[in-house]
Amino acid sequence: MGVLRLELPTDPRWVNIVEKNIEEILTDHAWCEQKAATNAITIITNNSEHEDLVTDLLALAKEELDHFEQVHDIIKKRGLKLGRERKDDYVNELAQYMKRSNNGSRVSGLVERLLFSAMIEARSCERFKVLSENINDEELSKFYRELMESEAGHYTTFITYARKYGTGIDVEKRWREWIAFEAKVIANYGNKETIHG
């Protein structure tokens, strides 16, 4: 997980909480995938002049919806129910930081949105890794290992475009600041059966 450079790793005991309510983690996970697809489409809508970004984020949005479907299939197969969409306090805190960090220019808006997206993908990827290595459920362990690889690719996509289109912005410095901020935020989580909880 070194490439993601997260400051605060997830305590593996979080998986013990998850295992007590598989329906809750799967429901939360399904909605995380839906929100990730919606986020990618929002970036496309606001930055349609960047043909390469549009092409790659269309593919990413489709993949996120495919993941939503995969999670929903697991829910159905297990006789569980997809609950209502959950509020994600972790993501909301990152979104507030993104808004505060935007200096008002289009370039800054795009870079901050891309770094926000990369941060969520990086943490999700790390959580999937922890799940795959610690959950006592062979099907879910395999599923989360496969998703982990996909999410790492998404993280890379967002960071790559932040670097490419962040003209006049020290993207590496901003990314380090994002990582430091995220560590403070995630320190308050890890005790709920949700992907970022």
Where are each of the predicted segments found?
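Non-heme di-metal
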Residues: M1-G197
